[in-house]
Amino acid sequence: MTAGLLRFDEPVGATPRASLIVLAGRGEAASVYTRLGRRLSADAYRVTVVPDVTRDPTHTAALVRGLIADSDPAPVVVVGSDAGSVLALRLASEPGSRIAALVTAGLPVNTSIEVDAAALIEARSACPVHRVVLADRDAVDPLALARELPAELRLPHADDVTVPVLAVHGEADVVAAIAGAESYYADLADGRLARVPGGRHDILNDVTHRSVAATIVLFVEELRVGAPTIAVTAPESVEVFAQ
């Protein structure tokens, strides 16, 4: 395993269902996504996490292309957070890419803010467990989000991204305002936007992390086998919608 990467495999005895490659954002070690990796791998996905894509975008892009080529089983879904979303979109726009679909989170259309480290933790997540991770200087560069994206990481034209895209974005994201991301996603050939009320920038690790992970699982399963038909009924004695 290449230094800095983390891998989470399916449970022993389970048949792997898909390969997910998670691309971390500005200043993030792969360990920032340990909780997400464990949760998704428990559902029999093979998950590989790539650290801070901004450290060396050209090298990281080549690394991820290799991971995509070697991934087994298909489908290969790339999950990007912050700057990782930009790289994911760029890779999916390349001719001949094996990427079957994307999940993008906190897409930074507006690429820099001016704020101190303490305020950035507040802006990133309301989850107390994740805030402990954010305070770890070995896992997160506290001021990385105040830096602009490297020149190599610019959004591709939406027309060049033809794979399905699940975009997850917090409505309270002050690092990357949802309005800018919405306008980009609206131009995608096959995009869907999951808006998270009250959600902050680290939407994969915010207080709604369980629901967000479940949304990703449903998206990948739909990609694999089609939209499920699930009938939900309530006993006659239960008033589902009380007046």
Residues of each region from the PLM?
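Catalytic active-site module of serine/aspartate enzymes centered on a nucleophile-bearing elbow/loop
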Residues: R192, P197-Q243
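Active-site nucleophile elbow and catalytic-triad environment of alpha/beta-hydrolase enzymes
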Residues: A139-A158
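Short alpha-helix in the alpha/beta-hydrolase fold that links the catalytic acid
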Residues: L36, V163, A177-A186
